[in-house]
Amino acid sequence: TIVLEDTKLNSNVFLSTIKLSAKHIDPTTGLGRIGQRNGTFVYASPKQRLKAVPTSNSELPHFMMTTGAITASNYNSEMYMSQRTAYIAEHDHVLGAVIVEIKDDKIYHFRQIQADAKGSFFDLGVKYTPTGFSDSRPEAFVLGDWHAGSTDPKARQAWFDVAELTSPKRIILHDAFDGMSINHHEQHYKLLKAKRAENGQLSLAEELKILAKDLESISALTDEVVIVKSNHDQFLERYLQEARYVQDPHNHRLALKLAIEVLDGKDPLKSAITELLKPEASKKIRWLSIDDDYAVEEIQCGAHGHLGANGARGSLQSMEASYGNSVSGHSHTPEIMRGAWCVGTSSYLKLDYNKGSSSWLHSSCLIHQGGSRQLVNAIDGEWHVE
């Protein structure tokens, strides 16, 4: 079907016929207000771009997304002033498409595919070629920021279902530890801490047990679990460095033990969790340090996204500038900007610290052989149409 006019797929997503220059550096420029008013829209561009548009304090965000191309790149120009943009467009050209599944008049699911020069592509652990299809295990499944103890059970089940279907070789975790029990952002909020105490959420030992149990469950789904050093993981190191445990009698003994680990040059979170894990789970887990590179199919997967170059604040732009092809986390908002991709979150979509309109979404990323990627989104626990 050739789309000649804007076409609604349901009440929340439509195909847009807006026409862009193929050399447009960022195909979302100036279009946010269209997504804000009219809903998620898919439109043509030889680049694959995804950007969220917050619309409400309580509703899910809308998205602007471009398709990629089904034609080979050809941006040749004899005009001197066009050669720069032609060169950039050649670099950013993607053979690909967006798959949109419609459940009903409100719910839809989308994910990206990229094709190689022979027309082969991967979707949900299956390789499709011009002559047939076959199972193909993803190289990695990067989960939306995990936040043990604040993980939404519906998102958790969705990712477990995806992992059981596709059997990824490795699962990569961002913000595996939440740090609610020792959160420095809340140390002066006495009434909030009183509420946490009533709910049993100020015990560091219990929070570590929750993470250990989660890691044992996740490790059963894959060959290797990779834990990316993230800002919430570092909450524990900060808690120990500032000796705030002196004011927390319920955490004091455990914190003293972990403080010695820091003095000995060890990662306190790794030490605490390793002691709690069953041996068969522990041997599958790889802990990255803050400066470790970790590449899957030449895609940087070892940076959480909270740090930019030279210790500056991180962003997807800084991930692209530093690493080129990457999959990061931190923002809780799925996004694609050329080779830099960002997953969403696995936590509840409303926490104590994200007030107002939100672009958060349950979203994770599959990395396939050759480096093709697709974001998988879960809406109320559902991630595709049965």
Model-derived regions: residue spans:
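A short C-terminal boundary segment appended to hydrolase-like catalytic domains
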Residues: K103-S136, G371-E386
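Conserved beta-sheet core of the metallophosphoesterase superfamily
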Residues: N12-F14, K19-K106, I299-E382
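A short, well-structured beta->alpha microelement
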Residues: T1-R33, G125-P130, K283-Y294
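Active-site-proximal loop/helix segment associated with metal-binding centers of metalloenzymes
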Residues: E90, A243-E298
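A structural signal for short, well-ordered beta-strand segments and their strand-loop junctions
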Residues: V42-Y43, M64-T66, H109-Q112, I171-H174, ...
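Core catalytic region of metal-dependent phosphoesterases/phosphodiesterases
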Residues: T1-T7, T151-L269
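Mobile, glycine- and charge-enriched loop segments
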Residues: S11-F14, G125-P153
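Short active-site segment of divalent metal-dependent hydrolases/proteases
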Residues: A148, D178, D233, L307, ...
